[in-house]
Regions:
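N-terminal glycine-/serine-/threonine-rich beta1-alpha1-beta2 phosphate-ribose binding loop
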Residues: 1-91
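Hydrophobic beta-strand scaffold residues
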Residues: 30, 96-97
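Rossmann-fold NAD(P)-binding glycine/threonine-rich loop
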Residues: 86-92, 99-115
Length: 115
């Protein structure tokens, strides 16, 4: 089995931890790493950022490219990015796991609507 995983908020503390977990699991393949357009790690290899060496998956801010051909997205990005990430996942029939905290009622309503 080869589950293609994408991580939103890939350069943050949780994102880096998830990169390590995905890399260590033989059934998972890191297929995307997404960050905000002002992130200093854009274009860098996600494995290098996570401290495990090159994985060949660079951090991008291009949501359309990121969501291309993923099975599941794990989102630990900011509350500002959740709405667009969730909408893209739903549109592309991609499973979506949200770990971001501090959600307001509007985001909770959107999550419930998309569930």
């Amino acid at each position: 089995m080869d589950i293609k995983v994408g991580i939103c908020g890939a350069s943050g503390k949780m994102g880096r931890s998830i990169i390590k977990v995905v890399h260590a699991d033989k059934d998972l393949r890191l297929s995307g790493a997404l960050e905000a357009s002002n992130n200093p790690f854009l274009g860098k290899d996600s494995g290098v950022i996570a401290g495990i060496g090159s994985l060949g998956t660079n951090i991008t801010d291009k949501r359309d490219l990121f969501f291309n051909n993923l099975d599941v997205v794990i989102d630990f990005s900011s509350t500002d990015a959740i709405s667009e990430n969730l909408k893209a996942a739903v549109e592309l029939n991609c499973s979506y796991v949200l770990g971001t905290t501090g959600l307001d009622n509007d985001l909770i309503d959107l999550i419930n609507t998309c569930s």
